[in-house]
C-alpha cells in the first residue's frame, strides 16, 4: 500500500494567455487533514478542479491508492471516493433541503442498466444528519421556504 492516498505530479493547466498551473505537485496521506493555501490566483481551485475531473490537465498524472488513474469527470472522482466542496457553491431555493445538501453527489441505485437518484436514501440520510446536528428542519422543505 502506498504512503499516499492521492498524488498529483507535474500538473500543468493553461487557459488562453495564462499558465494557471506550472508542474504543480500534491500529496495527500490517508487519515490526515490538509490545507491547501496560497494567494488569490495561485491555482488552488484549478488544481482541485483537475483532481475532480472538471478540468483536463494539459500535462501531469494522478495516482490514487498507488495506482496511476485518469479522472475525466466528476462522476469518476466520486466513484473513487474523491469529493470536492466548490467555493462558488450557491444554494438553490427551488430545491429541497436534502437536494441542496447532496447537490452533485446524490446517492444512486441501479434499476437494470439505469442509474437513478436514490431519493429514499437521500432523505433518510439527510434526516439522520439533521437529527445528529439537533436541527429541526424538514428535509423535504424547499430551501426558499425557510426563514
Per-segment meaning from a language model:
Residues 1-147:
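Glycine-rich phosphate-binding loops of nucleotide-dependent enzymes
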Amino acid at each position: 500500500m502506498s504512503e499516499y492516498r492521492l498524488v498529483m505530479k507535474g500538473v500543468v493547466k493553461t487557459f488562453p494567455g495564462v499558465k494557471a498551473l506550472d508542474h504543480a505537485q500534491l500529496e495527500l496521506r490517508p487519515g490526515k487533514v490538509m490545507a491547501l493555501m496560497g494567494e488569490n490566483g495561485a491555482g488552488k481551485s484549478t488544481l482541485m478542479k483537475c483532481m475532480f475531473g472538471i478540468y483536463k490537465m494539459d500535462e501531469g498524472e494522478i495516482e490514487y491508492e498507488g495506482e496511476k488513474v485518469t479522472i475525466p469527470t466528476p462522476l469518476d472522482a466520486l466513484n473513487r471516493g474523491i469529493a470536492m466542496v466548490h467555493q462558488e457553491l450557491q444554494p438553490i431555493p427551488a430545491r429541497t433541503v436534502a437536494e441542496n445538501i447532496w447537490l452533485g453527489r446524490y446517492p444512486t441505485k441501479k434499476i437494470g442498466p439505469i442509474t437513478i437518484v436514490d431519493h429514499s436514501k437521500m432523505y433518510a440520510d439527510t434526516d439522520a444528519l439533521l437529527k445528529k446536528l439537533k436541527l429541526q428542519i424538514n428535509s423535504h422543505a424547499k430551501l426558499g421556504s425557510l426563514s
